């Protein structure tokens, strides 16, 4: 008997791409089923509703990105290099899988309230890296939550501009500028 994992993965990928392209509201389960090459009812074997699909997909992808950044933050490198590596990672993944980041960017406001307190998230990883750098004296003092928000703004807002066509260059070409701006925020630009 099949376990349905391949079908669920196909549903998730097609849904993510359609949500990124058309928006969550405009995407129907019929659209997802057609894109995945399955019957619409098959979606309901995996999810109770489109809302549950959006929530679970967001949480899964958001946690996946948090875990990936946690690996970078856990490396035996200094804070400056860890922040640079995180931004390189973001720019590369955005360029390679724009649908994933578009989905996360465009659905985050409706989904962040669903994030469990104990989940490893990009925000928590960055905030903790900044706080650790402040403790060891490599990052300037200040509110680590505010600094994390500012660094994320430096990286995420250009991605939003890219999604909406205001920036059209290869996203990886922004890596150095974004890295230097992030370093400046946390006092690593010297």
Q: Predicted segment positions?
A:
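Short hydrophobic/aromatic patch on the recognition helix
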Residues: 36-47
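Hydrophobic/aromatic-rich alpha-helical bundle segments in the mid-to-C-terminal region
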Residues: 102-106, 135-181
């Amino acid at each position: 008997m099949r376990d349905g994992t391949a079908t669920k993965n196909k549903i998730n990928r097609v849904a993510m791409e359609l949500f990124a392209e058309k928006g969550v509201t405009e995407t129907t389960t019929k659209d997802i089923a057609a894109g995945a090459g399955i019957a619409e009812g098959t979606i309901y074997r995996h999810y109770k509703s489109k809302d549950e699909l959006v929530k679970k997909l967001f949480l899964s992808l958001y946690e996946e990105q948090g875990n990936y950044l946690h690996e970078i933050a856990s490396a035996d490198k200094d804070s400056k290099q860890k922040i640079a590596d995180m931004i390189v990672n973001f720019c590369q993944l955005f360029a390679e899988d724009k649908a994933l980041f578009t989905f996360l960017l465009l659905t985050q406001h409706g989904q962040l309230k669903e994030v469990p307190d104990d989940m490893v998230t990009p925000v928590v990883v960055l905030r903790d890296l900044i706080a650790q750098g402040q403790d060891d004296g490599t990052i300037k003092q200040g509110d680590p939550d505010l600094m994390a928000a500012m660094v994320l703004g430096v990286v995420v807002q250009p991605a939003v501009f890219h999604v909406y066509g205001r920036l059209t260059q290869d996203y990886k070409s922004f890596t150095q500028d974004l890295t230097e701006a992030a370093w400046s925020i946390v006092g690593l630009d010297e």
